[in-house]
Amino acid sequence: MNLDFSERYAARPLTESDADAILTLCAENEQFYRYHPPLATKESVLEDLSALPPGKSAADKHYLGFFDGETLVAVLDLILDYPQEGTAYLGFFMTQKAVQGRGIGSALIGELLNELRKADCKKARLAVDRGNPQSKAFWEKNGFALTGEEFLHGDSAYLPMERAL
């Protein structure tokens, strides 16, 4: 799969040396963490870089950054063939606050979905935090729909969403 699929931004795998830039991007997005506590820390960012669901290997994970020059504009955590073969799981997607509301996040997701389709993925899946209307609206705008499932997580729950490719 071609990971540098964005026409507008340079995409590359993120590493530990990018942790401060990732943390800065996350810290700008206080609203997300209102529904998904706790706030990101450098330690949690470093953990996320390599976190894998059961049964998956590092070869299945792509933790990508999208850059405008040296500026990190968006972060995407993608797991291929999870939770089943042919499904791409978007574990995390966040854009820099300064670019929100301008269609940039939707454009990146559109480019990602086109690339996943070319790679023979059949569907994309993700989960939003229950009670987060902004996240739910963003993903619905991008063609995702709630599956009807709910997975409890602390005092809240994750609501899976899917989109056929």
Regions found by a protein language model. Name each.
Residues 1-2, 155-165:
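Terminal substrate-recognition subdomain of acyl/acetyltransferases
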